[in-house]
């Protein structure tokens, strides 16, 4: 099961440690937000280190590998240092809307074409199906269907880029983790 989840966006790092207490009806604490002036591989590592919460166990690095032929993804040369530092495996689930990442073999090709397989292993977590995770205290959801490989990871680092998304409004860290680890049934 996942111990802790951290979201690292281009301009800030936002610990999601308050989520558990918020689900339980307790008042959540305001998160700390870290800013950097220049987005570099070194500053990505610096902002991660500022959390003082090292990734432990088997580490998933959730990001978007981008659509085939597209350019809307974090460049591997920007994130390589942080992925290497945490010893991470890049993880995603197949898309539910068709396109070049709807089938595992095509998804892996897109990841390779965009340079991600050159910096770390890539795991398409729903390649072997899905699992149901309980949602504690959920108002609208009692369970969430995610890729069957997700429970293999002990720690998740989420690297996100903010964007306008034709199908779902704005996309960023919350969309990256919610839709990005969901199986096709979990996206429905």
Residue ranges and their predicted role:
Residues 12-18:
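Hydrophobic h-region of N-terminal signal peptides that target proteins for export
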Residues 1-2:
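N-terminal secretory signal peptides that target proteins for export/translocation
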Residues 6-8, 19-188:
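N-terminal and secondary-structure boundary signal
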